[in-house]
């Protein structure tokens, strides 16, 4: 399979992507990681308004193969939750980088996106050949 690694995304070691938009962070899971999970059957996400610390779990993704937790790459308040993904988990599988985003985070302080991997660095990690 051919995966997308858009240049405007940065990635955490745990396969979450971050898109910085006007001081907010749109967070989802990479196309590569979603493909590894197989058919997604259930998505659970933290509540809007929840304040979480970097590294804390903000949700779980259940597939026919496994249940995986998703982690925040930065501390902050969840200001939006993608209810569409909860109602229709296939969105996450079919379009993880577009309609399948998970949450929008208002970081508690200025974040350095450079602390995360660039698209090229992430691609080299998950597809070393």
Curated annotation (Swiss-Prot):
SUPFAM superfamilies according to UniProt: Single hybrid motif (SSF51230)
Gene: gcvH
GO CC terms: cytosol; glycine cleavage complex
Xref: Pfam families: GCV_H
Textual note on the cofactor: Binds 1 lipoyl cofactor covalently.
CDD domains linked to this entry: GCS_H (cd06848)
Lipoyl-binding domain boundaries: 24-106
Modification N6-lipoyllysine occurs at: 65
The protein's required cofactors: (R)-lipoate
GO terms, biological process: glycine decarboxylation via glycine cleavage system
Subunit structure and binding partners: The glycine cleavage system is composed of four proteins: P, T, L and H.
Keywords tagged on the record: Lipoyl
Function text: The glycine cleavage system catalyzes the degradation of glycine. The H protein shuttles the methylamine group of glycine from the P protein to the T protein.
Entry's family note: Belongs to the GcvH family.
This protein's record includes keyword Membrane: no
Keyword ATP-binding: no
Gene3D superfamilies per UniProt: 2.40.50.100
Name listed for the protein in its UniProt record: Glycine cleavage system H protein
NCBIfam families linked: gcvH, PRK01202.1
Superkingdom, taxonomy of origin: Bacteria
InterPro entries per record: 2-oxoA_DH_lipoyl-BS, Biotin_lipoyl, GCV_H, GCV_H/Fam206, GCV_H_sub, Single_hybrid_motif
């Amino acid at each position: 399979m051919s995966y997308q690694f858009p240049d405007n995304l940065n990635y955490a070691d745990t396969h979450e992507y971050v898109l910085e938009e006007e001081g907010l962070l749109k967070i989802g899971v990479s196309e590569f990681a979603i493909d590894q999970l197989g058919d997604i059957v259930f998505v659970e996400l933290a509540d809007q308004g929840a304040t979480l610390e970097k590294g804390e779990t903000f949700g779980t993704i259940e597939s026919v193969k496994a249940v995986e937790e998703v982690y925040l790459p930065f501390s902050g308040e969840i200001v939006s939750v993608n209810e569409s993904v909860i109602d229709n988990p296939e969105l996450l599988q079919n379009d993880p980088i577009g309609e399948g985003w998970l949450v929008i985070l208002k970081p508690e302080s200025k974040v350095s996106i450079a602390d995360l991997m660039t698209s090229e660095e992430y691609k080299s990690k998950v597809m070393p050949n």
